[in-house]
Swiss-Prot record:
Keyword Zinc-finger annotated: no
Keywords: Membrane, Transmembrane, Transmembrane helix
Entry-linked Pfam families: Tetraspanin
CDD domains, alphabetized: CD151_like_LEL
Entry protein name: Tetraspanin-11
Principal location listed in the UniProt entry: membrane
Compartments (UniProt record): Membrane
Family statement drawn from the similarity comment of this UniProt entry: Belongs to the tetraspanin (TM4SF) family.
Lineage of origin: Eukaryota, Metazoa, Chordata, Craniata, Vertebrata
Topology relative to the membrane: Multi-pass membrane protein
Amino acid sequence: MAHCKTEQDDWLLAHLKYLLFIFNFFFWVGGAAVMAVGIWTLVEKSVYLSILASSTFAASAYVLIFVGGLVMTTGFLGFGAIIREQKSCLSTYFCLLLAIFLVELVAGVLAHVYYQRLSDELKRHLHSTLTEHYGQPGAAEITASVDRLQQDFKCCGSNSSADWQHSVYILSQEAIGRQVPDSCCKTVVARCGQRAHPSNIYKVEGGCMAKLEQFLADHLLLMGAVGIGVACLQICGMVLTCCLHRRLQQHFY
């Protein structure tokens, strides 16, 4: 027959439950934040995907959504384990926390590796995309992506506005005398690209390449910051879960 221990043990058990409950709430919020970053990436920045030659950028967003959903699901399970005070549920909760922590660790290493890959990919393909595919039949999505890129980042050309001088579009009759696309203009009006003066178009050192690389670096930093925050919470959660599990073992004997 099980016997309860002293009131002091009851006090410690109650406070451990409260601490773990608070942790689990912030852990769940962290999972929601991770998922939100992934969804934001797909919804707001998916226009740039056609510029890239691979699905690396999109894959990172789907990974964030998956991990965020897994964290939120684990959070719900954690609430149930804490309320029911079942050691088996706490053990399962601990294993899930550990598994997610290991997944985040691997994802962090892969993010660092694939960032360099993505950067190299941009350098290889952005220039050819602008000069060979912009404004061409069947490339409406690429054209829209490049226009959005130049307007959002206030840039012109992959490395400079001079890149457009070798563009198939600018050399064609469809350009109607434009020196750069209208999306290079500070104020976009019809045929404003006919005048490639610094007062009229964006002249940015490094062009859109530098701007897009900075965007990717900032995006990776955001993902890293959210990931580190959630990982730190997980370490605290695993410690608290072990303490609560041990206290439950000692509370009844």
